[in-house]
Amino acid sequence: MSELAVAAPEFAVVGVEPEPTAATPLLLFTVQVTDESGLEIYTIALTAQVQLDADRRAYDPATRGRLQDLFGEAARLPATVGPLQIGRVATMVPSFTGAGRFTLALPISADLELAAARYLASLPDGTAPLTFNFNGTIFYAGADERLQVTLVPWSCFARYRLPVSVWHGLVEQRHAGCGFVRLQSETLELLRRRRVERGLASLDATIAEALR
C-alpha cells in the first residue's frame, strides 16, 4: 500500500478588510486552504506574490484618460495593459486537517511613483482584479506520524476582485486625501527656496502656485 502524501493544496481568497492602525497601512486578506489527503498539516511556510491583472476589467473613457500615463495612449486600452506587481508577502499557515483559514497582510502605499498605487488611485469604483501566486513548504504528519516535507507547487494561485472602495477608504483614512511623489534633493531645495521667496505656507502651496 502506498503512503498517503499531500498533493497540491487549493487556495481561495474569501474576503478582505483594512487595517489602518498598523505602522504601515495593511489590507488583510482572508484565505482558505484545502487539502484532500486527510493528513494533519502542521504548518505551511507560505509566500504569495500579489499582482494586479489590469486586463481583466473594463474602463470608461474618463478612467482610460487617467491611466494614459501608465499604459500609454488611451485608445489602445486594454491592449496595452498588463499585470502590475503589488507586493510579496510571507506567512506561517496554522495547523489544519482538511481545510483551514489564515490571513495575508499586504502592505499598501499611496506613493504615486509606484505603478500599482497609481493604477488603484485612478479607478473611481468597481473592483481591481488580483492574482495571488503561491509557493512555499508544507510540513505535515505522514502515515506513521513522522514529519514529512513537500513543496507548494508553483501552479498554485487564487484570484480575487478587490473592491476599489476598500483601497480608497484605507488611503483616505490614513493619509487624509494626500498622495506622495518622490522628488530629487535638488528639486526639493528649489521648492524650499521658492516657498521662502513667495512667502507661501507649505510645499504643497508652492507646487500649486508654480502650476498655475
What residue spans do the PLM features occupy?
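Low-complexity, acidic Ser/Thr/Pro/Gly-rich terminal tails and inter-domain linkers that flank the onset
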Residues: 1-28
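Internal, hydrophobic beta-strand segments that form the core of beta-sheet-rich folds
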Residues: 47-53, 101-154
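Short aromatic-acidic-glycine turn motif
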Residues: 51-62
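Short beta-strand elements
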Residues: 65-74, 139-180
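Extended, solvent-exposed segments with strong compositional bias
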Residues: 66-122
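Surface-exposed, Lys/Arg-rich phosphate-binding patches that contact polyanionic backbones
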Residues: 185-202
